[in-house]
Amino acid sequence: MSNKKVQSPKEESIAKMLICKVHIGTKNLENKMKRYVYTRAKDGVHIINLAKTYEKLQLAARVIVAVSNPADVVVVSARPFGSRAVLKFAQYTGAQAIAGRWTPGMLTNQIIQKFIEPRLLIVTDPRTDAQSVKESAYANIPVIALCDSDSPLEHVDIAIPCNNKGKESIALMYWLLAQEVLYLKGSIPRSQAWDVMVDMFLWRDPEQFELKNLANEEAAPTAPHLADNQYATEAPYDDWNKKDDWNDNANEEWKNPITVDEW
C-alpha cells in the first residue's frame, strides 16, 4: 500500500504555482499590495502569499461564471508573454480576447468601429493595461487583474496577487482560472483532471520556431543518388566528337533547282 499523501485541489494548485514561480514578486512594493505579501527575501524580492492567491483565484472564477453570456467577458494583455494565454483562455471559456495594443476609446468612444460594451474586464497587468483599466472606470465595468507586488490597484475590483511578468506564471494563472471556470460551469467534473496542458497557454517566441525550422532543414537527408536513373546516365561523347560533313548526306535531288511545274 502506497503511503503517498493525496493532495487537495488547493495544495495541488499551490504546488504548481511554486514550480512556475508565481510567488516571486518584485523589489518594489505598492502600499495596497502589502496584505498579499508573505515575506521579503534577503535580496529584497517580495514573496507573495500563495494561499491568498488561491482564494482570489476562486473568487474571480465565481465572478466570471456569474456573467450569463461568456462573450461579455473581455480578457486583455498588452504584455507579449500573456498574448497566447489570453487567447487560449478565451478559446476554452468563450470570452473575448484582445492581445497586443489596446485601441484607445474601445470602451468609451461609440463612434469607432472597435467599440465594445463588456460586463467584465480581465487584465494581465494593471500597469501595462492601464488604458483599458482607466476606460473601464469611466464605463462602470468591474476589473479583475493579475497584480504583482508593485502593481497599482486603482480601479481594480479583484486583484489576484501573482507574478505577472514571467511567461510560466502568466500561463499557469490563466490555465488555473480557465479550469476553475469550467469546473463551476459543470463542463468538466471536479473528479476528472482537465486534459489541456499548461503548455498550451505558454508563450512561444516566433524566432525560436524559425531557428528550429532552419535546423530541421539542415539536418534533413539529401535527395537519393540518381546513378541508377536512366536520365542520369552520361551522354556518349564519341558521337559528339565526330566531324561529319552535312553536304555528304545530301541527295542529288536537293542540288537540282525547283521548276515551276512542280509547284
From Swiss-Prot:
GO cellular component entries: cytosolic small ribosomal subunit
GO molecular function: structural constituent of ribosome
Key words of the record: Cytoplasm, Ribonucleoprotein, Ribosomal protein
Record has DNA damage as a keyword: no
PROSITE patterns: RIBOSOMAL_S2_1, RIBOSOMAL_S2_2
Pfam family, one: Ribosomal_S2
Residue span of region Disordered: 237-263
Entries under InterPro entries matching the protein: Ribosomal_uS2, Ribosomal_uS2_CS, Ribosomal_uS2_euk, Ribosomal_uS2_euk/arc, Ribosomal_uS2_flav_dom_sf
Presence of the UniProt keyword tRNA-binding in the record: no
Biological process according to GO: ribosomal small subunit assembly; translation
Cellular location(s): Cytoplasm
First-listed, main subcellular location of the protein, grouped into a coarse class: cytoplasm
Protein family (similarity comment): Belongs to the universal ribosomal protein uS2 family.
Subunit structure: Component of the small ribosomal subunit. Mature ribosomes consist of a small (40S) and a large (60S) subunit. The 40S subunit contains about 33 different proteins and 1 molecule of RNA (18S). The 60S subunit contains about 49 different proteins and 3 molecules of RNA (25S, 5.8S and 5S). Interacts with ribosomal protein S21.
NCBIfam families on file: uS2_euk_arch
UniProt function note: Required for the assembly and/or stability of the 40S ribosomal subunit. Required for the processing of the 20S rRNA-precursor to mature 18S rRNA in a late step of the maturation of 40S ribosomal subunits.
Stated name of the protein: Small ribosomal subunit protein uS2
Source organism per UniProt: Plasmodium berghei (strain Anka)
Name of the gene: RPS2
